[in-house]
Design a protein with these regions (language model features):
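Terminal, low-structured helical/coil segments at or just beyond the last alpha-helical repeat
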Residues: 171-179, 236-265
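Boundary at the C-terminal end of the N-terminal hydrophobic targeting segment
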Residues: 18-19, 24-25
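Amphipathic alpha-helical segments of tetratricopeptide repeats
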Residues: 52, 102, 202, 235-236
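Short coil/linker segments at helix-helix boundaries
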Residues: 33-45, 66-106, 114-150, 160-199, ...
Length: 265
């Protein structure tokens, strides 16, 4: 058996690494095409393949996290097995996003995906667990915005955070004060909920969920005319997310519910 000259080993290793990197990039491109086609489960297959080739690939990590969130958020059922599976996907999405942050701490997407994964997971949990997640969601969304002022999803998460804090019950707020101290949840307010969602809409006006969540906040504060404007604005927007059909149905129902409501403020 012929021995490889020692001087050639670094060159061969470099060529192998380059080939793996190119293959990982190809898998990511395939995943991106499937993501755009609203097939997150198939996109995830390619992102996982990319990670098998290059486990430290930042782009593959955060995009795999995104695909997991997109798969999980479609699991809408009451069975315990389904709920357990859904939540496990959110947990894995968080893990991959955290790995992305370790690889690239100054990349906004990793921080944004941690906030998204935990934001989605928190909505499936009871009050105490939602409160436990609150500080991480806030910190990660804030960090994402600081790193990339055009990250519309991070603005959405931040606006939703303020709204969810305002919707907490008195008991949940008491628990939060015990856990984090008196001041943390005092940051939550309706003005910032509106401001952040308005920014998300401005950055990506074709995003249906931005309009829907902003409309729901307007309903909370009695601004029914503005809520109706947002609900009507999303009606003709193209489908670009796996839940957009559901969001449009929710918007139509809400619009009908508030059609005769008069502004309170």
């Amino acid at each position: 058996m012929r021995r490889i000259p020692a001087l050639l080993i670094p060159l061969l290793a470099a060529r192998l690494l380059a080939a793996q990197t190119a293959s990982a990039a190809s898998e990511i491109r395939s995943g991106d095409s499937l993501h755009a086609a609203l097939q997150p489960d198939q996109a995830l297959v390619h992102y996982r393949r990319a990670l098998a080739l290059d486990s430290a690939n930042y782009e593959a990590l955060w995009k795999a996290s995104r695909a997991l969130v997109d798969v999980a958020k479609q699991m809408d059922g009451k069975g315990d097995a389904l709920k357990k599976r859904r939540d496990s996907l959110y947990v894995e999405a968080r893990r991959l996003a955290e790995a992305a942050v370790r690889i690239n701490p100054v990349g906004a997407r990793g921080h944004s995906m941690i906030a998204q994964a935990l934001g989605r997971l928190s909505r499936t949990r009871g009050g105490k667990e939602r409160v436990r997640f609150a500080k991480i969601i806030y910190d990660e969304a804030e960090r994402a915005i600081a790193l990339d002022s055009t990250d519309d999803i991070a603005y959405h998460v931040m606006g939703a955070w303020h709204a969810e804090v305002k919707r907490l019950s008195g008991i949940q707020r008491f628990f939060a004060k015990t856990l984090f101290g008196a001041g943390f949840l005092d940051r939550g307010n309706w003005d910032d909920a509106q401001r952040y969602l308005l920014r998300a809409v401005a950055l990506k006006p074709q995003n249906i969920f931005h309009h829907l969540e902003l409309a729901e906040i307007y309903v909370d504060v009695g601004k029914y005319s503005l809520a109706r404007d947002q609900l009507r604005a999303l009606h003709d927007l193209p489908i670009a997310d796996v839940l957009d059909h559901q969001y449009k149905t929710q918007a139509a129902t809400l619009l009908d519910d508030i059609k005769n409501e008069k502004d309170e403020t």
